[in-house]
Swiss-Prot record:
It is a multi-pass membrane protein. This is Uncharacterized protein Mb0906. It comes from Mycobacterium bovis (strain ATCC BAA-935 / AF2122/97). The keyword Disulfide bond does not apply. The keyword Secreted does not apply.
Length: 94
């Protein structure tokens, strides 16, 4: 029988895709959040939480699909990196 575990995992391609997705998502989240922070900081925090809460169930379902799991990894790393960058930018302005 051909089991899914017998297939080789394309680490190089998958990590390249995840890195690209992470970069695009991180830039998008930082740029949009910086615009929202100018309006009101709580608006930026609230909309980030709503966006992540809405995306999380979909991404959680995709995490076991062979191709889509790399997008999930990239999205998670991108959002986490963007939040850390926003935190550093916000605390650095103080």
């Amino acid at each position: 029988m051909n089991d899914q575990r017998d297939q080789a995992v394309p680490w190089a391609t998958g990590l390249a895709v995840a890195g690209f997705v992470a970069a695009v998502i991180a830039v998008a989240v930082v740029v949009l959040s910086l615009g929202l922070i100018r309006v009101h900081p709580l608006l930026a925090v609230g909309l980030n939480i709503v966006a992540v809460s809405g995306l999380a169930p979909t991404l959680w379902g995709w995490r076991r699909t062979p191709v889509l799991r790399w997008f999930v990894l990239g999205a998670a790393v991108g959002v986490a990196g963007a939040w850390l960058a926003l935190l550093a930018l916000t605390l650095g302005d103080g």
